[in-house]
């Protein structure tokens, strides 16, 4: 009977260790995925601000050109 108790305890202990390792790996994978998402969103923000600045400069240049054309008339 004592042998069965020890065997059962060993099986349960090894199962808990295995589960703990799996959960730790899952957490690490989730952290890596979140970090990749953060890096991608930073890149998108940088790209969006560049596009916005180019659009502003183009609008200003177009406005100056239009005012210059009106001033020549």
From Swiss-Prot:
This is Dermaseptin-H4. Residues 30-40 have a biased composition (Acidic residues). Belongs to the frog skin active peptide (FSAP) family. Dermaseptin subfamily. InterPro entries: Dermaseptin_dom, Frog_antimicrobial_propeptide, FSAP. Keywords: Amidation, Amphibian defense peptide, Antibiotic, Antimicrobial, Cleavage on pair of basic residues, Secreted, Signal. The modification Leucine amide is found at residue 70. Has antibacterial activity against the Gram-negative bacteria E.coli ATCC 11775 (MIC=0.8 uM), and the Gram-positive bacteria S.aureus ATCC 12600 (MIC=0.4 uM) and M.luteus ATCC 49732 (MIC=0.8 uM). Does not inhibit the growth of the fungus C.albicans. Probably acts by disturbing membrane functions with its amphipathic structure. GO terms for biological process: defense response to bacterium. Residues 1-22 form the signal peptide. The gene is dpp-H4. Expressed by the skin glands. Its main location: secreted. Residues 25-45 are annotated as: Disordered. GO terms for cellular component: extracellular region. Residues 23-43, 72-73 form a propeptide. It is found in: Secreted.
